């Protein structure tokens, strides 16, 4: 305590301008730096900022889709013509912008990401054997990056247990003639408190290229809205962190409590010359078209049944499509806190045209709004909420569901590569109720509810309820399905004919419920 009192008294006296520090007597801190020397170096030329990124380097590139990507630093990498990069990114965006430009220029050898999405260039290079692709669950990727920055070499997670992530064998590289050349390795598995967890290793990079909103001249950085995403953890997990921002302000412009990334993590800063801030999925609030076809009628039926799963005060994560549309039917008297994996709690409706903001998107890359009381955070925090069981409900689509609740929705090997995104994380917590919404059969009338999934799993024995346009099933992870509700006009025999496994019929079977329009 005496030392702390002495320290406070010395700091209270101040330091003469130009002084190099204060020497304290033995046993106390030796000096207090007051020189203007800072860790962060400021640049005017983005090419100069990245010119020492060499061939074969590992580079983290911040952003989520196109939101919060370092546009100017990516353009600078194109000009340096560096090649054989190993890129770590949440996903690969689109073909003609952002990370897609590096792929088009053949500068990337390997990508570690969670989602390919609609980037057909990435998918085609991967399937042709021209690109290595290590697909990693989004929350696991965020935590691997966070661990790398925190000096934690590895950690255990429930995400991916019972899937190719744990078992190994996920395709990383194909030969030009379509054969597997490189596959993922199995993970070590341990059991804690009766649940299974797999060992994941931390990631560090040679460089991190990050997009902030503002930086002060000390190198402290703040981000805008949902553009924190992977930018924040990546700042902390590279040997050299280069940040581009829209504005540079004087030291003291940010209240200390408002700084998102302290300057200890920042090595280089530049003010971006220009920003396109392209929006991947511009989505505007509009009245629904009342002219719905047969398929839309089926979707509406699922949506209106799914809306009955919401409870007042719950925290929920909704996948794109039917799950998100179900939120339109939440009663005005009910409060449901909607969570988005890219770092939002308190999602509101889609924006009007004058509310559109490129820095405010959901996990489906759609423009959104945030309700009063909503908040933003980085991707590692977002998935801590998910893995930690703080989300009561997750609702998502599926390609296949088994009678024991196995879920497949992320890949058709050799044909369709989307990536798991955050789905594996969302279904990994034992505390979260998982509801699947989907059409009962494929377009060729093949059942999607099956004895056993034939596609790679997203989660093992993780689904609690299935809602289709024909029926509602409850899933018992050690027994068969139970038919709970049936659409009017259909019989149990109709459901048996369109379902690929046996199921029990509830003694309290009732007509399929619908929320009031």
UniProtKB/Swiss-Prot annotation:
The tissues in which it is expressed are: Testis specific.
Return the GO cellular component terms, semicolon-separated.
mitochondrial matrix; mitochondrion; motile cilium
The catalytic activity, as recorded, is:
a 3-oxo acid + succinyl-CoA = a 3-oxoacyl-CoA + succinate
Q: Which InterPro entries does this UniProt record tie to the protein?
A: 3-oxoacid_CoA-transf_A, 3-oxoacid_CoA-transf_B, 3-oxoacid_CoA-transferase, CoA_trans_fam_I, CoA_transf_AS, CoA_transf_BS, NagB/RpiA_transferase-like
Q: Which UniProt keywords apply?
A: Mitochondrion, Transferase, Transit peptide
Q: Where in the cell is it found?
A: Mitochondrion
What are the disulphide bonds in this sequence?
none
Which pathway is recorded for this entry?
A: Ketone metabolism; succinyl-CoA degradation; acetoacetyl-CoA from succinyl-CoA: step 1/1
Span of chain positions assigned to the transit peptide in the UniProt entry: 1-39
NCBIfam families recorded? pcaI_scoA_fam, pcaJ_scoB_fam
Family from the record? Belongs to the 3-oxoacid CoA-transferase family.
Give the protein name, as stated in the record.
Succinyl-CoA:3-ketoacid coenzyme A transferase 2, mitochondrial
Gene this chain is encoded by = OXCT2
């Amino acid at each position: 305590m005496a030392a702390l009192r002495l320290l406070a008294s010395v700091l209270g006296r101040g330091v003469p301008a130009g002084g190099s520090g204060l020497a304290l007597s033995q046993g106390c801190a030796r000096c207090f730096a007051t020189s203007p020397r800072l860790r962060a170096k400021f640049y005017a030329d983005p090419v100069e900022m990245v010119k020492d990124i060499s061939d074969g380097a590992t580079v983290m590139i911040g952003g989520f889709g196109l939101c919060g990507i370092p546009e100017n630093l990516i353009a600078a990498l194109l000009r340096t013509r560096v090649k054989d990069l190993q890129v770590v990114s949440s996903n690969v965006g689109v073909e003609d912008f952002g990370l897609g430009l590096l792929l088009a220029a053949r500068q990337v050898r390997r990508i570690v990401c969670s989602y390919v999405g609609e980037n057909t260039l990435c998918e085609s290079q991967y399937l042709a054997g021209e690109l290595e692709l290590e697909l990693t669950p989004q929350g696991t990727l965020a935590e691997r990056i966070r661990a790398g920055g925190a000096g934690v070499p590895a950690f255990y997670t429930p995400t991916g247990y019972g899937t190719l992530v744990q078992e190994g064998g996920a395709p990383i590289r194909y030969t030009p003639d379509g054969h597997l050349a490189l596959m993922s390795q199995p993970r070590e598995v341990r059991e804690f408190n009766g649940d299974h967890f797999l060992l994941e290793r931390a990631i560090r990079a040679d460089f991190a290229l990050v997009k902030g909103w503002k930086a002060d001249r000390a190198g402290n950085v703040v981000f805008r809205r949902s553009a924190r995403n992977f930018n924040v953890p990546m700042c902390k997990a590279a040997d050299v962190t280069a940040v581009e921002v829209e504005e540079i302000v004087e030291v003291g412009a940010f209240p200390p409590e408002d700084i998102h990334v302290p300057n200890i993590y920042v090595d280089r800063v530049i003010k971006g010359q220009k920003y396109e801030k392209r929006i991947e999925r511009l989505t505007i609030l509009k009245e629904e078209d009342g002219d719905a076809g047969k398929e839309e009628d089926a979707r509406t039926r699922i949506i209106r049944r799914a809306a009955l799963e919401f409870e007042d005060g719950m925290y929920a994560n909704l996948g794109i499509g039917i799950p998100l549309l179900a939120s339109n039917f939440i009663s005005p008297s009910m409060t449901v806190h909607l969570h988005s994996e890219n770092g939002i709690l308190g999602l509101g409706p889609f924006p009007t045209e004058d509310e559109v903001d490129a820095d405010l998107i959901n996990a489906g890359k759609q423009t959104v709004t945030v309700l009063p009381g909503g908040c933003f955070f980085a991707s590692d925090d977002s998935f801590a909420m998910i893995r930690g069981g703080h989300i009561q409900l997750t609702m998502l689509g599926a390609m296949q569901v088994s009678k024991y609740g196995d879920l497949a929705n992320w890949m058709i090997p050799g044909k369709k590569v989307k990536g798991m995104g955050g789905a594996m994380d969302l279904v990994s917590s034992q505390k979260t109720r998982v509801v699947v919404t989907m059409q009962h059969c494929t377009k060729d009338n093949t059942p999607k509810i099956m004895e056993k999934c034939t596609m790679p799993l997203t989660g093992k024995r993780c689904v609690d309820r299935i809602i289709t346009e024909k029926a509602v099933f409850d899933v018992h992870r050690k027994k068969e399905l139970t038919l709970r509700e049936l659409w009017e006009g259909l019989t149990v025999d109709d459901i048996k004919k369109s379902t690929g496994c046996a199921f029990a019929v509830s003694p309290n079977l009732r007509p399929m419920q619908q929320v009031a329009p």
